Design a protein with these regions (language model features):
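Catalytic pocket of metal/acid-base enzymes, prominently hydrolases
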Residues: 1-2, 7, 18-25, 51-157, ...
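Polyanionic/metal-chelating signatures
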Residues: 13-52, 71-72, 81-95, 104, ...
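Short, electropositive alpha-helical surface patch
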Residues: 128, 138, 166-182
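Amphipathic alpha-helical segments in well-structured domains
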Residues: 137-141, 168-169, 199-204
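Acidic-and-aromatic substrate-binding clefts and catalytic sites of carbohydrate-active enzymes
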Residues: 160-168, 192-199
Length: 306
């Protein structure tokens, strides 16, 4: 647990009206706010050690192992507002390193970060802001991952798909040649391979380069080998966060029916949505070729009303 930089090893982290669990999990994991608030209220721990201890009182089926979630680590040290508005100062960086060091000694798997561009916060006034891990610099990650590297643990992340060169630069953190010791790195993402048929070659090429004798890395890409089925209620789905128009729609409160109707009947919004939706489907690229020949762009299964 603790993937995509999100987790609960610091408890609810509620301070001064802030709800980090609700703010971070709602839109990324598609969980209703009322459910998350009940979960936060039930948390009796506020540190990584007590989080592990609480499992002793649960009737568990599978084994549980946890990453330290980077977004929650930033919030724990800097506070929610600061974690999405500025870089940490030296004392804050040292505090994050100290907490991470303690977690590694407790047996945590490593550090989890996130680079997907459609992971947004859900509470006002931050609905246009992404989760805290995405505001971290290369320097911050290098310092935190040096702790993970020292303990021979794992860096779990999702690729920075907006900028391939930046993603490649960040993935060099796996290199033992550049940073003294190889860092086990797991990069995970769900993709439609039919929409990007050459992506597997790109991933394998990057891994081959970084894991070569020249750079001595330990990078492994993970992808689901089957259909990725997502259940959602209408437009409310993390997958629709990719478009700025639908992200604006999802940012409204779930039960704000009137607000959604106003937005969907706004001519400017309608035009923007149509432009974004048709992008890549009306030209001479692969997506357009696929659509013209009737190949599925995506599969929507509607549950019959009971």
């Amino acid at each position: 647990v603790g993937n995509c930089s999100l987790g609960t090893c610091f408890g609810s982290q509620e301070t001064e009206g802030q709800e980090p669990i609700v703010d971070c999990f709602t839109r990324v994991e598609n969980i209703p706010k009322k459910v998350l608030r009940k979960c936060a209220e039930a948390m009796t721990w506020d540190n990584p050690e007590d989080y592990l201890k609480h499992f002793e009182n649960l009737n568990l089926g599978p084994n549980i192992a946890a990453f330290v979630p980077h977004s929650m680590l930033r919030i724990e040290v800097m506070g929610l507002d600061a974690s999405i508005s500025r870089a940490p100062n030296e004392l804050e960086l040292q505090k994050m390193e100290q907490i991470l060091e303690g977690a590694m000694e407790l047996g945590y798997l490593g550090l989890s970060t996130d680079g997907l561009p459609f992971h947004y916060l859900s509470n006002d006034p931050h609905t246009d802001k992404r989760i805290p891990t995405q505001f971290a610099s290369f320097k911050e990650l290098r310092r935190l991952l040096s702790v993970v590297r020292k303990h021979d643990r794992v860096w779990q992340t999702t690729p920075i798909i907006e900028n391939r060169l930046k993603a490649l630069f960040y993935f060099t953190l796996t290199s033992g040649r550049l940073f003294g010791k190889p860092l086990k790195t797991s990069a995970l993402s769900a993709m439609e391979m039919t929409a990007a048929p050459n992506s597997s070659k790109l991933f394998l090429g990057v891994a081959k380069l970084l894991n070569s004798k020249l750079l001595d890395g330990r990078l492994h890409f993970q992808a689901l080998g089957t259909n990725f089925r997502v259940w959602s209620d209408g437009i409310v789905s993390p997958l629709f966060e990719e478009l700025s128009s639908t992200a604006e729609l999802i940012a409204l409160e779930y039960d704000d029916y009137e607000g959604r109707q106003r937005l969907m009947h706004d001519p400017e919004w309608v035009e923007r949505f149509r432009k974004e939706w048709r992008h890549g489907r009306t030209g001479d690229d692969f997506a357009s070729w696929k659509a013209k020949r009737g190949l599925p762009d995506s599969l929507v299964i509607r549950e019959p009303e009971k």
